[in-house]
Every structure is written in structure tokens, then in C-alpha cells.
């Protein structure tokens, strides 16, 4: 896993070395503990000179005031005190990490005038620091442009109750590790991370108590997974289906289930993609990466739930054995599918994975994640994932979790008028409905493989990779879905 900084918590005390970060509300002043770190009272003059107003995540930096033992100081705005949310504290932590890029020892004085920060808020500052500190540079031979290495950095967050904050951060850190893992998997080049290697990364979760089974091509053939195997047949790299189980709930409690599309590289197959930006298709397994990251987070924080994670891992290549347009395959469900476009392959992988999950585990619900369609980017851009669901309660809970974490979703329609667009004379269905409503017809296709199980499909093509940089992510891979689904579980399916 990518290196992380050390994050600790302590009581308020005068900083003795390194860099110091102070927090100031919009239009406000330094808090009592922060004021003690500025004995000469020079920071208000710095604010005035820099026209610093305390806007959320705004930053001003200066040399340490005379008479202090530390080297540099940065002040970060916390914005309007009445508008602060969980996301705000993550952003503040991210701004702190950015301000301390070239510092080894950093003290964050989590004291805001007029506010009493909770342990959870202090922990979220730490999580924001963790998320912003992620840098994927393992293949760079010269890494100095990224400042001091994360492993050599230590952030000490001073707060009112450091013991409670440390306890809260233990869970937050587990979540951060899950995001790091998902980002690592998506950022990894496809020549390094094939289906077998990806499965090995998931298998490593056994060290956390996750039960992991890896189904081979032969085992999938016995199960009748013709849809998934049809995608894989053009690659010399064999496919895998990985089944992860975390049993932290009651013995007879039905599990919650998460299914991820894991196309480790997508050329489009015989319906080959244009060359421009094809390198980004190493990230066409971001849905599977999020599921692995989520299972890591649930296990690491000892979530009191039973959860199943299933990922279908294939490579879509155009060799002489590759699937052709016009082919008809039989899915595990027994339903037949006419292949119209071999670049609509992710839904074929998910069709068998969803059916296997439904039949094998009878879960409370299934949520699948997939970088499924470019159409969802046209519809929603990069700020929301597309949400399609057959269950209003599940949809509402996902939407609320998205608002809380900042990993936002937007519900899209489903209906018979869209479903008929994937009908065909030659088989039970075809794998694409054409240009119109492309993300919706893809979801309608998946819906045919879930029966009455409560289900949601998250199309994360616009949010999982190549999204705009933010206060908590500067990486090409965002790890989208890990925090969203962890919150869904924590709020509704534990205990």
C-alpha cells in the first residue's frame, strides 16, 4: 500500500519544532490555544496583509513569529461556523496536508474560536490529511518533486480530548486505508495488474479475517458463466471471480452484498476503442477496486455486519479467439445475450457476478459499482455517480450517504420504455441499446439479473478516475465508493 504519514493526537501545548497550523473561522479570530502559539500577536497583521478572511480551506503561510520555537506557520480558514459539515473537516485536513507539503514535523492546533471541536471532528481532520497525502509515485525514479515522503511526515493534532480523538481516528484510519488500497489498484498499470494479480491483492485481505475464495476459469465454466467468460476469451490472461466474506454480524444475519466490475484493461475488443486516451482503460476495474477497498475498511474497523464482496476480473482484448459482434452467449442465469458491441463488456461481467451473488448468498441487498458507460459522464459530469435502483429505500440511503461523505450520487430513471431497447429477435436480449439513453439501457440490462433482490447500480465512470482534483484527492484514481458504501453500512446495517 502507498506510504502514509503518521498522525497522532495530543493535548494543547506550545509547539517546539517544525511547522504549525492554526485554524480561524470566517471573519473571526484565533482561539485561545492558537493565540498561545502566537505570543507576539503578529498573525492578525498577517491576515490583514494577505486579505485573509477565513474562508473554508483558504490558507495563508508565514515564517514563525518571533519568540516561538517552531519554523513556519500556516493558517487555514474553517469558513462559516454554522455551515461546517463532516466534509468541511476533511477539506480542512486536506488543506493542512497541502500547506505542510515540505514539512516533516507538523502540529495542527485544532482550536477554533467559538467552537468546541468533537473527537470525531478532530479525527476527520486527520482523515483529510491522510486522503490528501496520497501520492502514487512508485514508478518514478526521481520523487523529490512531491516534497518530503509521506512515511517521513508526522502530524500531531492538538485537541481537547486526544484519547477520544485517537479512538475515533482508528476507524477513520481503517477507512482511509481502504481508500488508499482502491486508489492503488486503479492507478496500477495493467501490465502489472492482471486478473490473477488483482485476485492476489484481494486474497491478502485474509490477514484481516476476510474469507476469500478465488474461482478459476474452469470453475466458472462449470457454473455456466458464459457472459463473463465470453469477454475474457480474447485475452491470454485467465479470468477470475473473487468472493470475499466478512462475518462480523450475527451468525444467521443475511449479508449485505457489493459487486464490482473488474476489467483490468479494456481495449474494446473487436469493437476496438480509439487510440486517444485508451491508456485510461487500465482503470476500468475501479468498481472492483472500490469493493476490495470497502471490504478492507469493514474488516479493519471490525464492522458489526455480514458483508459479501464479489468481483469479476477479466481483460478485454481483440485477438483471434476474441468474442465477435453477432455472437450469442448464455449467462449463468440461463438467459441468452446477443453481442452487438464487444465494448459493452462490463455489463456481461456483472450479469454473471450479480446472478452468482443472488443465488449463492440471498443478500439483504446488492450494490454493484462499475465504470460502465461514457453516457453517464455526458449526463452527470464528474461530480455525481449515476444511481439506478429497483428499491426506493436503498436508493434514499445511498443518496444520504453520498451527501454525508461527499461521494455524491444522482438517481436516474428505469422503466419498460427503456427495457425494450435491449430486446432482440435473436436472443433474450442484446448487450447494448444503441446511442440513446446509454447509461439507462445498461442499467436495464443489469436489472434482468437481480430478480426481486433490492439492488442498486452505481455507474462511477465519471467519478472513479480522472476526476478534478479536490482538497482530499490529487490522484488520478479517487477511490470513489469506499467511503460512500462504508457510510451506508455504518448508518443502516450494523449491530
Swiss-Prot record:
It catalyses: Release of an N-terminal amino acid, Xaa-|-Yaa-, in which Xaa is preferably Leu, but may be other amino acids including Pro although not Arg or Lys, and Yaa may be Pro. Amino acid amides and methyl esters are also readily hydrolyzed, but rates on arylamides are exceedingly low; Release of an N-terminal amino acid, preferentially leucine, but not glutamic or aspartic acids. It is an enzyme of class 3 (hydrolase). HAMAP family: Cytosol_peptidase_M17. It comes from Chelativorans sp. (strain BNC1). Binds 2 manganese ions per subunit. GO terms for cellular component: cytoplasm. Mn(2+) 1 binds at residues 266, 343, 345. Keywords: Aminopeptidase, Cytoplasm, Hydrolase, Manganese, Metal-binding, Protease. Its EC number is 3.4.11.1, 3.4.11.10. It is found in: Cytoplasm. This is Probable cytosol aminopeptidase. Mn(2+) 2 binds at residues 261, 266, 284, 345. Presumably involved in the processing and regular turnover of intracellular proteins. Catalyzes the removal of unsubstituted N-terminal amino acids from various peptides. The keyword Cell inner membrane does not apply. One of its GO terms (molecular function) is metalloaminopeptidase activity.
Amino acid at each position: 500500500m502507498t506510504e502514509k504519514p503518521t498522525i497522532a493526537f495530543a493535548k494543547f501545548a506550545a509547539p517546539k519544532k517544525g511547522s504549525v497550523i492554526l485554524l480561524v473561522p470566517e471573519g473571526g479570530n484565533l482561539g485561545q490555544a492558537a493565540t498561545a502559539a502566537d505570543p507576539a500577536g503578529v498573525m492578525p497583521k498577517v491576515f490583514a496583509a494577505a486579505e485573509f478572511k477565513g474562508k473554508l480551506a483558504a490558507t495563508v503561510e508565514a515564517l514563525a513569529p518571533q519568540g516561538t520555537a517552531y519554523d513556519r506557520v500556516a493558517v487555514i480558514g474553517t469558513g462559516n461556523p454554522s455551515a461546517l459539515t463532516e466534509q468541511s473537516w476533511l477539506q480542512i485536513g486536506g488543506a493542512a496536508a497541502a500547506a505542510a507539503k515540505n514539512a516533516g514535523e507538523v502540529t495542527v492546533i485544532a482550536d477554533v474560536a467559538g467552537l468546541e471541536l468533537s473527537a470525531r471532528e478532530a479525527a476527520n481532520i486527520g482523515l483529510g490529511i491522510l486522503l490528501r497525502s496520497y501520492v502514487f509515485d512508485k514508478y518514478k525514479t526521481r520523487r523529490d518533486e512531491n516534497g518530503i515522503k509521506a512515511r517521513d511526515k508526522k502530524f500531531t493534532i492538538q485537541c481537547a480530548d486526544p484519547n477520544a480523538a485517537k479512538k475515533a481516528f482508528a476507524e477513520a484510519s481503517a477507512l482511509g486505508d481502504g481508500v488508499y488500497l482502491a486508489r492503488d489498484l486503479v492507478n496500477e498499470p495493467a501490465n502489472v495488474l492482471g486478473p490473477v494479480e488483482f485476485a492476489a491483492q484481494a486474497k491478502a485481505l485474509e490477514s484481516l479475517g476476510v474469507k476469500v475464495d478465488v474461482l478459476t476459469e474452469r470453475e466458472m465454466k462449470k457454473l455456466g458463466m458464459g457472459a463473463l467468460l465470453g469477454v475474457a476469451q480474447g485475452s491470454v490472461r485467465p479470468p477470475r471471480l473473487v468472493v470475499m466474506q466478512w462475518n462480523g454480524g450475527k451468525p444467521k444475519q443475511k449479508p449485505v452484498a457489493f459487486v464490482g466490475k473488474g476489467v483490468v484493461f479494456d481495449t474494446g475488443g473487436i469493437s476496438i476503442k480509439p487510440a486517444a486516451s485508451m491508456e485510461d482503460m487500465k482503470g476500468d476495474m475501479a468498481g472492483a477496486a472500490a469493493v476490495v477497498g470497502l471490504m478492507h475498511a469493514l474488516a479493519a474497523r471490525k464492522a458489526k455486519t455480514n458483508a459479501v464482496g464479489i468481483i469479476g476480473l477479466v481483460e478485454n482484448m481483440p485477438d483471434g479467439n476474441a468474442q465477435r459482434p453477432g455472437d450469442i452467449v448464455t449467462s449463468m442465469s440461463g438467459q441468452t445475450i446477443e453481442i452487438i458491441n464487444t465494448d459493452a463488456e462490463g455489463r456481461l461481467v456483472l450479469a454473471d457476478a450479480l446472478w452468482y451473488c443472488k443465488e449463492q448468498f440471498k443478500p439483504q441487498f446488492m450494490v454493484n459499482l462499475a465504470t460502465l458507460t461514457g453516457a453517464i459522464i455526458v449526463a452527470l459530469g464528474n461530480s455525481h455517480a449515476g444511481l439506478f435502483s429497483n428499491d426506493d429505500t436503498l436508493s434514499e440511503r445511498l443518496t444520504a450517504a453520498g451527501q454525508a461523505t461527499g461521494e455524491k450520487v444522482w438517481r436516474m430513471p428505469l422503466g419498460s420504455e427503456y427495457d425494450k431497447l435491449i430486446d432482440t429477435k435473436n436472443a433474450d436480449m442484446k448487450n447494448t441499446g444503441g446511442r440513446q439513453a446509454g447509461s439507462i439501457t445498461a442499467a436495464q440490462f443489469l436489472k434482468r439479473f437481480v430478480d426481486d433482490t433490492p439492488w442498486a447500480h452505481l455507474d462511477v465512470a465519471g467519478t472513479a478516475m480522472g476526476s478534478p482534483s479536490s482538497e482530499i484527492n490529487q490522484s488520478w484514481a479517487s477511490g470513489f465508493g469506499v467511503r460512500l458504501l462504508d457510510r451506508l453500512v455504518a448508518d443502516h446495517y450494523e449491530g
